[in-house]
């Protein structure tokens, strides 16, 4: 079963469209894919589970995201925030070319004059880093967090999320990246396997975040 939830968000502007509280349930469509692509789309779950998808409606176009069932803390937290209306009127407050877009910060929400909204945001979400099954290829929905010094357990922020974009890698650029990470040694979170290297060459992404975020 596939459940689709629609919310309104903002992109690079402080004016939100009217919030929508709309939820649809549709049968899951099973589509045959090449073996390698199956591993690049790990949110495709067995028929007897529910695949939760959220449609972000922004002033720059719509973004559809899928939530992984094997990261249940993050899935449930995101759905809770969506269903509460928290993200309606939020902006993407951090946009970095060839890296990612980040939204959800409490201080960047549009507040309707005269309307009182109370949201509990003073908590963190336990880390659910499942690497190398999930990695930072282009288009991944991820939870933001504080840095390692302040946050050694890598717990995620309650509301902030980002969607990866990253850069395109040629085979030679990917080879150079791996060589550089080997030289970094302990400073590197992870070295991408040959399979993940091919994924980054094919799709692009942000490999230096792997196994750390």
Annotate each language-model stretch with its function.
Residues 1-24:
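Bacterial Sec-dependent N-terminal signal peptides
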Residues 19-213:
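Cyclophilin-like peptidyl-prolyl cis-trans isomerases
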């Amino acid at each position: 079963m596939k459940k689709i939830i629609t919310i309104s968000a903002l992109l690079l502007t402080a004016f939100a469209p009217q919030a929508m509280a709309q939820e649809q349930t549709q049968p899951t469509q099973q589509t045959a894919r090449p073996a390698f692509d199956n591993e690049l789309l790990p949110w495709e779950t067995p028929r007897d589970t529910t695949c939760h998808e959220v449609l972000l409606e922004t002033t720059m176009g719509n973004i559809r995201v899928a939530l992984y069932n094997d990261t249940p803390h993050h899935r449930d937290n995101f759905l809770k925030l969506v269903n509460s209306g928290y993200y309606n009127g939020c902006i993407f407050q951090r946009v970095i070319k060839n890296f990612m877009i980040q939204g959800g910060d409490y201080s960047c929400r549009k507040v309707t004059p005269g309307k009182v909204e109370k949201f509990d945001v003073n908590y963190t979400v336990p880390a659910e880093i499942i690497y190398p099954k999930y990695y930072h290829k282009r288009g991944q929905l991820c939870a933001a967090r504080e840095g390692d010094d302040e946050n050694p357990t890598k717990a995620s922020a309650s509301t902030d999320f980002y969607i990866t974009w990253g850069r395109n890698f040629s085979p030679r650029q990917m080879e150079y990246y791996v060589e550089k990470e080997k030289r970094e040694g302990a400073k590197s979170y992870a070295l991408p396997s040959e399979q993940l290297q091919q994924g980054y060459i094919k799709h692009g992404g942000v490999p230096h975040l792997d196994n750390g975020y």
